[in-house]
């Protein structure tokens, strides 16, 4: 209950540190002190204090720039709205209408994984169809969200099939090998036909189906069943998606949806003012995880490599060093916003891997997946931009909103 309320607050009510910067700028404008002016941190504090004293003495403050937090990146046209600002602004644009659909699909994905854990055949099939329907609605409402939601759904199908409670189903599937061969032939035929017809995405999707079912032929009975569950549910979701989207696609028109290398990056101070809350929470979480894994052990014992667990600790340590060096290089070559996002994504993926090899808590795995995807989305606009965008305006706008949703939840 408390976790849900906190997630709701971070998602729908919380703001950014940029509001604090705006108030600081107001007081700095009326500051009359010149002591240590221009000094970092100390000078900023004295400027604020001087402005506060001037305000107490009756000097009026400049008007608050309420529009500023939605344009936090200086020197470009990036739109940096966050959900609370969007709700206050109240303009019924696709990004606002897409927010409940985005959160709905995340909730459905979690429900799907839990139903698979309990071996609920009917529930999992219905939820797979609802995932396809939600993605179709997202495409018709706010197309920017669809690639991310497709990735979330695929991750859910992977975890659902790998954790499915198969004991209750094994007795009802006595001819899995024949089913695998049937799916292989059907998928390969559709993939070949789509490739000849120039339907690249359809060919790629069914080629993946053919590859998956081909592997299942040579797998153990349990693994074959899990791979078939993945294929079945993914096809159910895809068919549901196509039933609703095909009529829509016949009446829509798009222009040059490719990606290109961006020429702009987020100023690091502006980036931190917007995302500082979430990075602070992420840092606290990572420190807690590291403390739990090293509880009761000295730093010296970590590098005592005569035991297997110590060797794993040494490997983990050097991997973290590599992540830091790669992030530092990205910061020097491209920008520190990309460096911090990439480092966060790498560390969270590392913790996700350790969790999957260890206790395999679905709750923690789900949270780590949301963190990893959120950091990856923040890194994306620092490298690529959608073609025909005005600089990075809408690319940052739409993907930062997605990142906020994922990190908050």
Predicted features along the sequence, with ranges:
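Aromatic-rich transmembrane-lumenal/periplasmic boundary elements in polytopic membrane proteins
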Residues: 2-88, 259
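Membrane-interfacial loop-to-transmembrane alpha-helix junctions, especially the N-terminal start
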Residues: 3, 119-128, 175-184, 223-240, ...
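Specific aromatic-rich, kink-prone transmembrane helix
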Residues: 56, 60-73, 80-82, 98-117, ...
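Membrane-interface alpha helices of multi-pass inner-membrane proteins
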Residues: 86-89, 128-141, 187-197, 326-329
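Membrane-interface transmembrane helices that cradle and orient dolichyl/undecaprenyl
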Residues: 105-125, 155-182, 210-219
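Hydrophobic/aromatic-rich transmembrane helices and adjacent perimembrane loops
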Residues: 149, 393-409
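Hydrophobic transmembrane alpha-helices of multi-pass, membrane-embedded glycosylation machinery
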Residues: 150-159, 207-216, 344-350, 409
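Juxtamembrane "helix-exit" motif on the non-cytosolic side of transmembrane helices
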Residues: 248-254, 330, 381-389
């Amino acid at each position: 209950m408390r976790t849900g309320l906190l997630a709701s607050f971070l998602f729908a009510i919380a703001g950014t540190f940029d509001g604090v910067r705006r108030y600081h700028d107001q007081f700095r404008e009326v500051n009359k002190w010149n002591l240590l002016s221009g000094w970092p941190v100390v000078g900023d504090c004295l400027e604020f204090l001087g402005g506060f004293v001037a305000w107490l003495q009756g000097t009026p403050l400049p008007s608050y720039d309420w529009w500023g937090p939605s344009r936090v990146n200086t020197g470009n046209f990036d739109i940096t709205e966050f959900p609370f600002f969007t709700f206050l602004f109240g303009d019924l644009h696709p990004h606002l209408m897409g927010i409940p659909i985005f959160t709905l699909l995340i909730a459905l994905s979690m429900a799907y994984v839990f139903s698979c854990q309990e071996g609920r055949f009917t529930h999992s099939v219905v939820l797979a169809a609802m995932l396809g329907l939600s993605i179709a609605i997202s495409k018709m409402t706010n197309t920017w969200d669809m690639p991310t939601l497709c990735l979330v759904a695929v991750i859910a199908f992977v975890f659902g099939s790998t954790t499915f409670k198969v004991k209750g189903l094994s007795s009802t599937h006595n001819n899995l090998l024949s089913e695998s061969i049937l799916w292989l032939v059907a998928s390969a035929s559709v993939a070949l036909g789509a490739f000849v017809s120039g339907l690249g995405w359809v060919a790629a999707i069914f080629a993946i189906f053919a590859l998956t079912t081909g592997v299942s032929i040579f797998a153990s009975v349990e693994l074959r069943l899990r791979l078939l569950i993945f294929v079945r549910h993914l096809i159910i979701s895809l068919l549901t998606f196509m039933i609703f989207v095909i009529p829509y696609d016949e009446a829509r028109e798009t222009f040059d949806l490719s990606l290109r290398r961006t020429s702009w990056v987020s100023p690091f101070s502006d980036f931190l003012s917007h995302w500082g809350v979430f990075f602070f929470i992420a840092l606290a979480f990572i420190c807690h995880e590291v403390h739990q894994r090293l509880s009761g052990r000295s730093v010296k014992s970590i590098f005592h490599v005569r035991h297997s667990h110590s060797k794993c600790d040494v490997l983990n340590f050097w991997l973290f060093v590599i992540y830091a060096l790669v992030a530092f290089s990205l910061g020097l070559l491209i920008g520190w916003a990309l460096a911090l996002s990439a480092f966060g994504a790498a560390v969270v993926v590392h913790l996700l891997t350790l969790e999957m090899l260890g206790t395999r808590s679905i709750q923690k795995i789900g949270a780590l997946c949301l963190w990893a995807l959120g950091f990856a989305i923040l890194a994306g606009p620092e490298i690529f931009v959608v073609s025909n965008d005005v600089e990075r305006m809408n690319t940052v706008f739409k993907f930062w909103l997605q990142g906020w949703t994922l990190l908050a939840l």
